[in-house]
Amino acid sequence: MSREVFICDAVRTPIGRFGGSLSAVRADDLAAVPLKALVERNPGVDWSALDEVFLGCANQAGEDNRNVARMALLLAGLPESVPGVTLNRLCASGMDAIGTAFRAIACGEMELAIAGGVESMSRAPYVMGKADSAFGRGQKIEDTTIGWRFVNPLMKEQYGIDPMPQTADNVADDYRVSRADQDAFALRSQQRAGRAQEAGFFAEEIVPVTIRGRKGDTLVEHDEHPRPDTTLEALARLKPVNGPEKTVTAGNASGVNDGAAALVLASAEAVEKHGLTPRARVLGMASAGVAPRIMGIGPVPAVRKLLRRLDLAIDAFDVIELNEAFASQGLACLRELGVADDSEKVNPNGGAIALGHPLGMSGARLVLTALHQLEKSGGRRGLATMCVGVGQGLALAIERV
C-alpha cells in the first residue's frame, strides 16, 4: 500500500536570459541557492534526517559534472551525511527528480527528500572527444548548450537527428498547426507572464540570487526572459528557423536560459516529526515514448497514461502547466487532449516561451508554479507536463491540501 507524499515547500531562482545576469554563476552554486533557502525557511527540520537530494540536470558536460546534486547540497550547508543524486531525462530532469522522490517516499524507503533541478545553459561548454586512434585528426568540437552531440551513427540512420526546431516544425506539419496560431499562442504566454510579474505573482516562489562583483554585489530578483510588450506584428516579422515554408521562429519557441528550483517532499510521519506544513500531495507521475522526430507530442501519451492510472479526466484539473518548448507542440498537445488553445487553466502566468526553459530546472518549475497557482486561485488539482528530447513525455499531478 503506497503512502501519501506531500510537497511542503517549493522555491526557485529567477530565470536568467542566455548570457544574462545568472551567466556569472556556476550551476552548482546556482543549485545551492534554492537548497539553502529551503533550509532557512524551515528551521524546525532536522536536516540530518534528510534521506536524499534529487536534482535534475540535462547537460553535465561542464561545471555541472560529477554529480551536481552532491556538490550543491554541500555548498548549501546541508550535513555531509546527506546523500545526493543527479538525474537526467533531458528537459524533464527536474520533474523526474520530483517523481523519483515521490516514489521512494510512497513505497516507504524514504521519509524526507528534496527534489528539483538546475541548468546553466549560458555556461554550457564546448567539448571535443578523443581520437579513435593514436595521432588521429579531424576531431569535432561540440557545443553542449542544447541538442544532439556525439551522435551514434546507428541512431542517425534509424531515427534521424532532427534538431529541436525541426522536430517542432515536424509537429506543426503533422498536426496542422499554423504559423498564425503559434504566434498567437506565444503572444498569450508573453502577456500572461507580464501580468503575473506586474502583480507580483512570482515573488512568492522566487528567492533572489546574489552576484558578487568587484564593484559590489548585485541582487537578481526577477525573471529576465519575458517580453510583455511583444506584439503579433513583431512576431509575424520573424523569419522561420528552418526555411521560408516553415513556421517555427525564435518568437514562438522557448528560450535558452539559466535557473534552479527545489521542493521539500515528505511522508505524513515526516511532516509531523519536523513540524512541516503540507501544501499539496503528489498524486502520481507517468512517462511515455514517441517518435524522436515529433518529440514535442510526448505529453499526450504521458498525460493519458497518468489520467488512466488516477482514474481522472483532463477537466478534473484546475491548472495545467504545459512546458512551452515550442508553440507548435504546445498547441498540438492541447488539441489532442481536448483543451482549448486559449484555456485560462493552461499556463495562466505564462510559460516557457515567455519565462524561459533552463532544461534541468523547468520540470521542477512547472510543478512549483502549479502549486502556487492552486493556492492563489483556490483550485484543487494541478497537472504539469512536458515533452522530452529524443521522443518522450512526462506528466505529474498534484492536489492541494
UniProtKB/Swiss-Prot annotation:
GO MF, any single term: acetyl-CoA C-acyltransferase activity
Broadest EC class assigned to this enzyme: transferase
Entries under CDD domains matching the protein: thiolase (cd00751)
Catalytic residue positions: C91 (acyl-thioester intermediate), H357 (proton acceptor), C387 (proton acceptor)
Gene3D superfamilies the UniProt entry points to: 3.40.47.10
Keywords noted in UniProt: Acyltransferase, Aromatic hydrocarbons catabolism, Transferase
Keyword 4Fe-4S in record: no
Reactions performed catalytically: succinyl-CoA + acetyl-CoA = 3-oxoadipyl-CoA + CoA
Enzyme Commission number, as recorded: 2.3.1.174
One GO-annotated biological process of the protein: 3,4-dihydroxybenzoate catabolic process
Pathway: Aromatic compound metabolism; beta-ketoadipate pathway; acetyl-CoA and succinyl-CoA from 3-oxoadipate: step 2/2
Keyword Transferase set for record: yes
Family under the similarity heading: Belongs to the thiolase-like superfamily. Thiolase family.
Function: Catalyzes thiolytic cleavage of beta-ketoadipyl-CoA to succinyl-CoA and acetyl-CoA.
Entry protein name: Beta-ketoadipyl-CoA thiolase
Taxonomic lineage from the root: Bacteria, Pseudomonadati, Pseudomonadota, Gammaproteobacteria, Pseudomonadales
Gene that specifies this protein: pcaF
